[in-house]
Amino acid sequence: MSFSAIGDCQLISQLYQYKKHRVICSVKVLPTPVTHFERESKNDFHWMTADRWSRIECGLWRLFENLKQWQDAYQLDTELIIDHIIVRVQATNKSHPATVALLAGTESSSKDLCLDLQLQYITQEDTTIVDVIPAKRELATEAETNGTRPTSRKIRVANSGSKPKAGTQSKPKHIDADNEDDKSSTTASQPTKIKSERRSISQGGEKDKASSSSPSSSQQSNRIKRSHSPSQQNSRSSSVEAKPARRSGRSPIRPSRFKNFVVGETRSGKSRGPKPKVKRVSPVPAKDFKVEHMDGGRFNALQRLDSMLDTPKPREVKILLLEKMGEDEVLNTFENYRSDFDKLFKEREFKPRTSHYMNIAHMDVIDILSKSIHQQMLKKLGEVYSSRSNHTSLLVNGLLPLWIVRLFMDTYTLSQSEAVQQIRDQMKYNTYLRALNDEPLSSDLD
């Protein structure tokens, strides 16, 4: 189904045949406005597809099925939502002039149902989610202490002046030449570790041995390069203090899960002797019990099993069928039983489900007539009484068994109770014979 992409709307004329009624539809398809990026909005009719069109037609048929009387269709004025489509249905007195070409020369009558349908697709605007790129976090500054301004970590590291550059070696004073040569090679070979540069003074460590005790000597040592010990030269820390020894990853405290266990000690010696071999008792062959030797419990169980297997044989009856009646002969009897059909239909019209008629369901009478005659009988009943969807069980399990019971009564000259009892007995006896002869369940007319 193709539509042009221009115009304010698209008009479609359609002619349907619903049962015995002719339905003339004039469909108005509204476009969907589509707006592209930095462009003007345009009308789009491509949302209507063949699949959606078939769903709209199915929704129209369901609307007709839910009508109790066909006369209510001439007063339709409703709105449906089918597959994200708003369907406006309104009955009119006159059809659209464009539908005259669909009538093939015939004129529309007053019995024709004229409908105006308006289709509008429910659109939903897209929402664009823009991710916000967070800015880089600045280094946290230290809190002001004693009225001084907070200084960043970078400034403090720069002022310390004790951080050696990577790949270079410092020249400490008062160090032997041998130790200097050994440490210079190890310092150049070690890579730079950023983690050690951020180690704070609060971690502890020994004080620098090169610092003097007097204030004057400490001021002089600040002007010149400080001497580093071999342990300080190996350290990459930005602090003037020595790097403490790395603590082992294993805690010296024993975990609580080993509280009830003895770790590292030998178990109390218990002599484990060989396990005694268990002698297996060989099964004793079962003895043949006689009825006289059985106790009360076994005898009662045997009696219950025997009663379960003892199925009573149904009453033997002659199986009566209606195989001599033809299709036209059966359908012509519809008007004879019309009053009985109307009475049962009024009683069960608003019931949610019908399971049987006088304890006779559809499966009990399915073998009395052929399959083709069954289908024609259901079709005839559906044309007259099937105005609502919940009447299916009433037709199959109510009206159809009633019709066959009436045929049984007239053919074999039986009363209603005799005909019902005959159908029940012959169904039970036929099932018993097929089970006795190991034959599959099938119709006697096949």
Curated annotation (Swiss-Prot):
The lineage of its organism: Eukaryota, Metazoa, Ecdysozoa, Arthropoda, Hexapoda. Residues 194-210 have a biased composition (Basic and acidic residues). This is Uncharacterized protein CG4951. Residues 211-221, 229-239 have a biased composition (Low complexity). Residues 269-280 have a biased composition (Basic residues). Residues 159-170 have a biased composition (Polar residues). It comes from Drosophila melanogaster. The keyword Phosphoprotein applies. Keywords: Phosphoprotein.
